[in-house]
């Protein structure tokens, strides 16, 4: 029983180490700018494409434009 607990704790610690090593710059960009979204100019799929738009809930602010013809279902996908 104690061995299983020790293995579980070690796996948990390893998982936390991996998660904390994820690119912190990407997290800072999301915190500063909001949630990224896929503009029409980014391509048809999110796989391998950069998400150049930002979701705004109350419409695009001044200096930004809606960069997606359809969706997202909540808010607008805007690009500067």
Swiss-Prot record:
Outcome of substituting residue 51 to A: 209-fold decrease in binding affinity to cockroach sodium channels and correlated loss of toxicity to blowfly larvae
Remarks, miscellaneous: This protein is encoded by at least 3 different genes. At least 3 other genes code for a similar Av2 with an Ile (instead a Val) at position 35.
Effect of residue 74 to A: 16-fold decrease in binding affinity to cockroach sodium channels and correlated loss of toxicity to blowfly larvae
Protein known as: Delta-actitoxin-Avd1c 1
Compartments in which it is found: Secreted; Nematocyst
Biological function: Binds specifically to voltage-gated sodium channels (Nav) (site 3), thereby delaying their inactivation during signal transduction. Has a strong effect on crustaceans and insects and a weaker effect on mammals. It strongly inhibits D.melanogaster sodium channel (DmNav1). It strongly affects the heart sodium channels (Nav1.5/SCN5A) and weakly inhibits the brain sodium channel Nav1.2/SCN2A. In vivo, when released into the medium, this recombinant toxin induces impaired swimming, paralysis and death of the crustacean A.nauplii within several hours.
Organism: Anemonia viridis
Keywords: Cleavage on pair of basic residues, Disulfide bond, Ion channel impairing toxin, Nematocyst, Neurotoxin, Secreted, Signal, Toxin, Voltage-gated sodium channel impairing toxin
């Amino acid at each position: 029983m104690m061995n299983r607990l020790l293995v579980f704790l070690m796996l948990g610690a390893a998982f936390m180490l991996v998660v904390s090593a994820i690119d912190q710059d990407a997290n800072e960009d999301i915190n500063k700018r909001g949630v990224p979204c896929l503009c029409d100019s980014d391509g048809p799929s999110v796989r391998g494409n950069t998400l150049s738009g930002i979701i705004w809930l109350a419409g695009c602010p001044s200096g930004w434009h809606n960069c997606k013809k359809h969706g997202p279902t909540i808010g607008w996908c805007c690009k500067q």
